[in-house]
Amino acid sequence: MTADAYPKRRILVVDDEPLVCDAVKMMLTFDGHVVQTAHNGADALALFNKEKFDLVITDFLMPVMRGDQLAAAIKAQNPKQPVVMITAHAETLQASQTPLTGIDALISKPFLLENLREAIARTLPVEQV
């Protein structure tokens, strides 16, 4: 899927590693999206409560609030809000008995830009694509 294959979106990227946030922001900005970043779940939730985002992309393990906790808090406010998780722990989480509540797509780190584009296309509601 090419960058022009879907509309441009407002995306919130959450990761405690600034380099990861910057890399994902650069990839998504290259595709024309408007991207904001946060470095923990609590800061992300505060941003989410102030602004409207078409998509939230979050890491799993972060200080203050994990990504699954952030997703649950977001879905409690807006059940239709798409949330994608990017994590180095994808295989462990998928094998776990505990379901990832509120996660619409899971991407394993490291990942390719194409994986991210596909997750965006899959998770956004049809009327937005």
Question: Can you name each region flagged by the protein language model?
Answer:
Residues A46, D68-P79:
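Short amphipathic alpha-helix used as the core "switch/output" element in two-component signaling
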Residues M62:
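Receiver (REC) domain active-site loop signature in two-component systems and cognate sites
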Residues L12, T37-L55:
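Acidic, metal-coordinating helix/loop segments flanking the phosphotransfer/catalytic sites
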Residues M1-R10, E114-V129:
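Non-catalytic signal-transmission and effector/linker regions of two-component phosphorelay proteins
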Residues P18-Q36:
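Two-component/phosphorelay signaling modules centered on CheY-like receiver
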Residues Q69, A90-I107, E114, E118-A121:
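Alpha4 helix (beta4-alpha4-beta5 surface) of REC/receiver domains from two-component response regulators
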Residues H39-D43, M65-L70:
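Acidic catalytic/metal-coordinating carboxylates
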